């Protein structure tokens, strides 16, 4: 089985529990539109909590992925934070807005074709929401 490696950026739109310790992560990526990734061992008791933290909704990640010609689902070789978020994970208002944004994008974006303008807009929106001090309550209207 031939595996092709590639580097990309993505934004977490949705996650699903898979088995005892795995999960399926749906990302909006810069190079391939909406794609699904299998992550094994992320929810096990062996201390992968830091990896699990990367897959919160609307978190921006940079990663090296593996694509197989036989599988529709991709895998991660390496994942790291794409934007260091200062307030989004800790502010309930911002987290709620991020949840809403992720749900809207997950339901609306179905294509697997790259859409660089949409990706850049969403990536910038995550950074803007994290940096915002005032007007947070109306951010979803702007989005």
PLM regions: where:
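Non-catalytic alpha-helical scaffolds and adjoining flexible linkers that form interface surfaces
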Residues: 1-143
């Amino acid at each position: 089985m031939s595996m092709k490696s590639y580097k990309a950026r993505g934004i977490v739109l949705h996650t699903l529990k898979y088995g005892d310790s795995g999960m399926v992560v749906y990302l909006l990526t810069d190079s391939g539109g909406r794609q699904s990734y299998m992550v094994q061992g992320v929810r096990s008791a062996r201390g992968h909590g830091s990896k699990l933290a990367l897959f919160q909704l609307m978190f921006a990640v940079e990663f090296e992925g593996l694509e197989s010609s036989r599988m529709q689902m991709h895998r991660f070789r390496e994942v790291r934070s794409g934007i260091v978020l200062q307030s989004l994970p800790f502010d309930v208002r911002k987290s709620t807005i991020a949840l809403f944004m992720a749900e809207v994008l997950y339901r609306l974006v179905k294509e697997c074709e790259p859409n660089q303008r949409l990706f850049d807009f969403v990536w910038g929106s995550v950074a803007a929401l994290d940096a915002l001090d005032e007007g947070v309550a109306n951010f979803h209207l702007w989005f």
